[in-house]
Amino acid sequence: GEKFVIIEFFKGLDISFKLDGMGKIFSGMVSVLWPLATLYAFSYMEHAAKKPVYFMFYTLTYAIVLGISFSANMETLYLFYECLTLATLPLIIQPMTKQSKKAGRIYMYLSLFGSALAFFGMMFLLKFTDGTEISTDFVSGGNLILLSQDQESLRFAYFLAFMGFGVKSAIFPMHFWLPLAGAAPTPTTALLHAVAVVKSGVFALMRLTYFAFP
C-alpha cells in the first residue's frame, strides 16, 4: 500500500502508516475479536467501579493496536508500542487489589526495560541509515542488510530491538508478568492474552525479523 506520512521530523525519521498484507491480517483479526471481547466486558463490568474510565482505556487500546497494525516503519511501531503500555496499565490495576497492583508494577517495570532495549536498538539503526538512501521502513524481505559496513553492530541492534519488543510477547526470560496479570478483570486478561498485547508483541517481532532485517 501507499505510505501516508503523518509527521516528518527529518529525512529518514517520520511517523507514517501503510497498509500491507501483514497489517491487513493483524488488523482484521483484531477487528473481529475485539467486538466479541467488548460484549463480554460490558456484561462482566456492569457493576464495577469507575466503569467509564475502564472502557475509555479499553477503547483507546483498540485504537493503539490498529496503529501498530498500520505502522510503516520502526519509529511508528515503537511509538504505538509504548502507548500500548500506558493504555493497558490502568486496565490491569483496575480492581486496585494488592495482587493487581503488584501485577501492574511488574508489567510496567518490564515494559520500561523493554522500551529501553528497543529504543537503543532503534537508535543504532537510525545511526546506520543516516546519510544513506536506506530507511527503517518495513519492506517485505527487509532492506537493512544493505547496511553492510558493520554486520556485527547490525546484529547487536537487532538483538536489542528483538528483546525489547519481545517483552509484550512474553518471551523467556521476560514472561512472568503474564501469569501475574491474571489478577486483572477477566476482560483485561482476554485482552492481554488473546487480542491485543501478546499478539502485538508477536506482530512486532515478525515485522522486525521479516520486514526490517532479512
Language-model-derived ranges and their functions:
Residues G1, M29-S43, T61-A63, L84-Q94, ...:
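Central hydrophobic cores of alpha-helical transmembrane segments in multi-pass inner-membrane proteins
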Residues G1-M56, G131-S148:
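Transmembrane helix-loop-helix hairpins at membrane boundaries of multipass inner-membrane proteins
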Residues E8, V53, A103, F156-P214:
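Short helix-boundary/re-entrant hairpin motifs in multi-pass inner-membrane proteins
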Residues K24-S27, S31, F55-Y62, L112-S115, ...:
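Residues within membrane-spanning alpha-helices of integral membrane proteins
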Residues D14-L19, W34-A48, S153-F156, L180-T188, ...:
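Short juxtamembrane and helix-loop transition motifs at transmembrane-helix boundaries
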Residues G21-S31, M74-A87, E152-V167, P214:
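Structural signature of hydrophobic alpha-helical transmembrane segments
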Residues V53-Q149:
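Alpha-helical multi-pass transmembrane bundles of energy-transducing inner-membrane proteins
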Residues S27-A41, Y62-S69, S115-G121, S200-R207:
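Helical transmembrane-bundle signal
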